[in-house]
Design a protein with these regions (language model features):
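Short beta-strand segments enriched in small/hydrophobic residues
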Residues: 28, 33-38, 72-88, 188, ...
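Short hydrophobic/charged patches on amphipathic alpha-helices used for structural packing
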Residues: 69, 123-126, 149, 186, ...
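Short beta->alpha connector loops
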Residues: 116-119, 140-145, 264-265
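Acidic, Gly/Pro-rich loop/turn segments at junctions of secondary structure
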Residues: 136-149, 161-170
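Structural motif
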Residues: 83, 138, 258-260
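Amphipathic helical "hinge" segments at domain boundaries
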Residues: 63-128, 132-136, 217, 221
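N-terminal helix-turn-helix DNA-binding module of bacterial transcription factors
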Residues: 1-78, 347
């Protein structure tokens, strides 16, 4: 009778629930670990027949190379984290895609998370990503104190802030010209005859909201217009709050004839309120929005290039990771006024 192979001579199989290892592949193919390593890493020195046997074992076992272990030996994880403010905000879609495209071009994986506009959640998420040894962070900040990141930055975690600057630390920041864009948008309304112009924006502690309000005030001052408190409203962007603000501006003793909306979430509610009015009210919105050109009239906007912001931030991040000695820089990208009709309506009275 043929001799029964000893247990140790039999090809081993991975235990249920465990990922197959190179040792499992070597046992199944009847070769050494070094041979499997050469095949997996595309190295020379393996005959075609041996390579075929190793590849068959890989396919049969479902083996996948452990890239995490490989990159950790090199001191990198080939991963970067992106901390967004609000995943539901359409502004962050093209921004996130642009960051991911740059990361992919550098062979890195992008890990997304949302702070939900909560500073504590932002800190928790950023530090959790650092604990998982991401090589770098791109952060849209919800808070205004980022000293908690100092130890991580000193440890070599590349960091770039987007849309708003960091607080309490010197770090790269890529953002739009919020002040200049708002100033241009309000000046556009003034140029079409408006003197009573309302401003509805996000919470004042948010950098973009305060800068856009500053642009509004400056444009009104440039035109010699004294702004009434009733014309300005900053706060949460939930529809109920924005609706109340818009209705009060439109029905008060000195009703506005035009509205400048501070972001696309505000704009959606403002459009609904204006559609219910018996008179036509001009509108310029900060941030473009989908289907804005299909409304009647089309919505005049101050457009940001979210993809360019994300791409610039990611390029900056990988330059840091590649060892470039860069001083922290604030990079402001220009906005663009797109006239579609709503911002060109004359005053109704």
């Amino acid at each position: 009778m043929p001799e029964t192979p000893r247990r140790a001579d039999r090809p081993s199989a991975p235990r249920y629930g465990n990922r197959p290892t190179m040792k499992d592949v070597a046992a199944r193919a009847g070769v050494g670990l070094k041979t499997v390593s050469r095949v997996v890493n595309g190295e020379s020195g393996v005959t075609p027949e041996t390579e075929r046997r190793v590849q068959e074992a890989i396919d049969a076992l479902g083996f996948r190379r452990n890239d995490s272990a490989r990159v950790l030996r090199k001191g990198r994880t080939a991963s970067v984290g992106l901390v967004l403010e609000d995943l539901a905000d359409p502004f962050y879609g093209p921004l996130s895609r642009a960051v991911e495209e740059v990361a992919r071009a550098h062979g890195a994986l992008l890990i997304n998370g949302s702070s939900a506009e909560d500073p504590d959640r932002e800190q928790e998420l950023a530090l959790a990503l650092c604990a998982r040894r991401v090589d770098g962070l791109v952060i849209i900040p919800a808070g205004d104190d980022h000293r908690y990141l100092e130890p991580e930055i000193k440890a070599g975690v590349a960091t770039v802030f987007v849309d708003r600057p960091a607080g309490g630390i010197d770090a790269d920041c890529v953002l739009s010209d919020n002040f200049g864009g708002a100033r241009q948008g309000v000046a556009h309304l003034v140029a079409h005859g408006h003197r009573r112009i309302g401003f509805i924006g996000d919470m004042p502690r948010i950098h973009t909201a305060s800068e856009r309000l500053r642009g509004y005030r400056t444009a009104m001052e440039d035109a010699g217009i004294t702004v009434e408190d009733a014309w300005m409203s900053l706060g949460a962007t939930d529809p109920a709050r924005v609706r109340r603000a818009a209705e009060e501006m439109l029905s008060g003793p000195s009703p506005v004839t035009a509205v400048f909306s501070g972001n696309n979430r505000v704009t959606v509610t403002v459009i609904r309120v204006l559609a219910e009015q018996s008179r036509r009210v001009a509108l310029v919105a900060f941030d473009d929005l989908e289907l804005a050109d299909l409304l009647q009239p089309g919505v005049t906007v101050v457009a940001q290039d979210a993809a360019a912001i994300g791409r610039t931030a990611a390029d900056r991040l990988f330059r840091q990771l590649d060892g470039a000695l860069l001083l922290p820089e604030r990079i402001e990208l220009p906005t663009r006024l797109i006239a579609r009709g709503s911002g060109e309506l004359p005053p109704a009275d």
